């Protein structure tokens, strides 16, 4: 194995001289604690293992990496370490992200090498002592090998990505990421560029009003205990005991509750939702809601660091391409709790979300003429749907009828049953309708929005004949589905994920052009939260909205994209 171990400034200068003609470099790091020990870097012919413990002046290395593209595996990890040294590459290609896009089940470097190159890597030195004063030859060889492997993997994975289908996004072929790595797949271009954004999102963290969090947690815990005591005094049953609760509800209140697979009476939320009008059920559901809020507040408190939380984001957290977050999860914060997130002194949040984006994507994906026309005319889709299925003028639609239309739209584009619609309307939107009413509304929806019925029928037919449905989002993200629900969800939600990520990339590029400092602090499916100085907020809002609408024009060719924004020092829309 050919590589050079670099331990001094002269050796570093020589290495950089040989590497500086390459538009992209292969990179990996070995770390210990919060420091980088080794930076392994190479081009098509040369591999260097650079020991940062031995080199004082790393400015030449910083300049080399910052001006180039980097190929690596799980690059978010390396980028967060490099950032501490003032190093951040201008473009990224991540073989782990490529593995997700190509549909592999396992994404470690070893698994990818085994799949594509046909051999196994020796990972026994991964957890060795990288802080040792003298590194062994075996450690150095292990470190160098990761770069050598990346050199073999990159062209194979790039060529496979370039075969992904795409209906949209040809504008992205002109971007820096596309040119540096010779990428032709729009969705791959977006995901590779987005690696940098996820690293920055984790570095930035999300600011919290610590006093508000502490007070809210105490208040919620007090209220929870009060409700539990009230329940016990009234019914002499512990509301947190499934066994005691099941006995109370079935024997005293004669509720016909379903059984679990083990034959026990089920008292989970789903089983109880049909009986919300029964007093003990109502109380139990309130207690559970309070407990969930308390648990979430505790989770946030556990992860506080310098007045912020620093979640881990998984760039592709689902088949759809949607992100997920953990430690803490800040994508499932209840609206009542969002006010505990507060921008730092002198700063504010710019909060922007895509308006009715799932419906807009669905209308374009299935090419429904009625829905397309309504969006082109700038109609409020929920009000419009209510008027269509209820046979009323749009201006006569009540607030409750519009709520019902939300359940109809978001439920029926995905083909839920009449029973499912009645439950969804009650649970999700607080509107009660009978099974018969749900059936009539369902029939009227599909009679008017015919393309959705035709799409659902095609999906069912393909599932019956082939056992699976294969397809891709409008930007070319592949998916394979074995159930009807997945087959209709994946292309819509996947296109939504593509759209959000592209919007963030355009926003970052536009910020850099203007030289404005603003931090991305959270992303939730169709919402972008940015922290910036109060004086810059209006300008940042304008740039963010423009970026989101431009992303919309790239992915959605027929439906206009609308964006709703607020400027607030707390993460609330009020």
UniProtKB/Swiss-Prot annotation:
Coiled coil: none
GO MF term (any one): DNA binding
Catalytic activity: DNA(n) + a 2'-deoxyribonucleoside 5'-triphosphate = DNA(n+1) + diphosphate
Pfam families noted in UniProt: DNA_pol_A (PF00476), DNA_pol_A_exo1 (PF01612)
Alphabetical list of InterPro entries matching this protein: 3'-5'_exonuclease_dom, DNA-dir_DNA_pol_A_CS, DNA-dir_DNA_pol_A_palm_dom, DNA/RNA_pol_sf, DNA_polymerase_A, RNaseH-like_sf, RNaseH_sf
UniProt KW keywords: DNA damage, DNA repair, DNA replication, DNA-binding, DNA-directed DNA polymerase, Nucleotidyltransferase, Transferase
Domain of life (superkingdom): Bacteria
Gene3D superfamilies: 3.30.70.370, 5' to 3' exonuclease, C-terminal subdomain, Ribonuclease H-like superfamily/Ribonuclease H, Taq DNA Polymerase, Chain T, domain 4
EC number: 2.7.7.7
Biological process annotations from GO: DNA repair; DNA-templated DNA replication
Top-level enzyme category: transferase
3'-5' exonuclease domain segment(s): 4-161
PANTHER family for this protein: DNA POLYMERASE I (PTHR10133), DNA POLYMERASE NU (PTHR10133:SF27)
UniProt family annotation: Belongs to the DNA polymerase type-A family.
Protein's recorded name: DNA polymerase I
Species annotation: Aquifex aeolicus (strain VF5)
